[in-house]
Curated annotation (Swiss-Prot):
Keyword Isomerase: yes
Name used for this protein in its record: Galactose-6-phosphate isomerase subunit LacB 1
Classification via InterPro entries: LacB (IPR004784), RpiB_LacA_LacB (IPR003500), RpiB_LacA_LacB_sf (IPR036569)
Pfam families in the record: LacAB_rpiB
Record organism: Streptococcus pyogenes serotype M1
Catalytic reaction(s) noted: aldehydo-D-galactose 6-phosphate = keto-D-tagatose 6-phosphate
Lineage: Bacteria, Bacillati, Bacillota, Bacilli, Lactobacillales
Cross-referenced PANTHER family: DNA DAMAGE-REPAIR_TOLERATION PROTEIN DRT102 (PTHR30345:SF0), RIBOSE-5-PHOSPHATE ISOMERASE B (PTHR30345)
Binding partners and assembly: Heteromultimeric protein consisting of LacA and LacB.
Similarity comment: Belongs to the LacAB/RpiB family.
UniProt-listed GO biological process terms: D-allose catabolic process; galactose catabolic process; lactose catabolic process via tagatose-6-phosphate; pentose-phosphate shunt, non-oxidative branch
Amino acid sequence: MKIAIGCDHIVTNEKMAVSDFLKSKGYDVIDCGTYDHTRTHYPIFGKKVGEAVVNGQADLGVCICGTGVGINNAVNKVPGIRSALVRDMTTALYAKEELNANVIGFGGKITGELLMCDIIDAFIKAEYKETEENKKLIAKIAHLESHHANQEDPDFFTEFLEKWDRGEYHD
C-alpha cells in the first residue's frame, strides 16, 4: 500500500517520524514535502497529497500542519478527496468506516507523534462499511465538489508565497 504524506515547515520533524513509522510497517511512502524547516505555505502540500491520492499514485494520504485545520481544509478542496481532521481513534475509524475517508489530517503540535502513528495505523487497517445510507451520503458530499480550472495554474499559490517571503504571515 502506498501512503502520500505532506506537511508544512512547522511540523517537518513530526512528518518525518510518521513517515519512518509507516516505512517500518512496510508501507511505501510518497513524501509530498515539505522537506525542511524553510518557511512555506501548507495549502501547497495539502494539494499535493490530495492529487497523489486521486491520481492513483497513493492509496491513502496523511496531512499534517500545526493545528491540522489549514492543511485539512486545503486537501479537502481537491475533488475526490474525503479527509477528516482527527485527534482520536474513534473519529479516525468513523471517517474511514462510514465516510470512506481517503486522507487523514492531524495537528502535529496538537496530537502527539506516537498517538498519530497509532491512529494512522488503525485508519489504514480499517475497512469502509458500505451501506446504502453511506453511499448516498458520500454521493451528496461529492456532489458539492466543483473543479476550478485556475487550480491547474502553476502560479496558483504565487501570491501567497510572495507574502510568506515578505513575512506577512506568522508561524
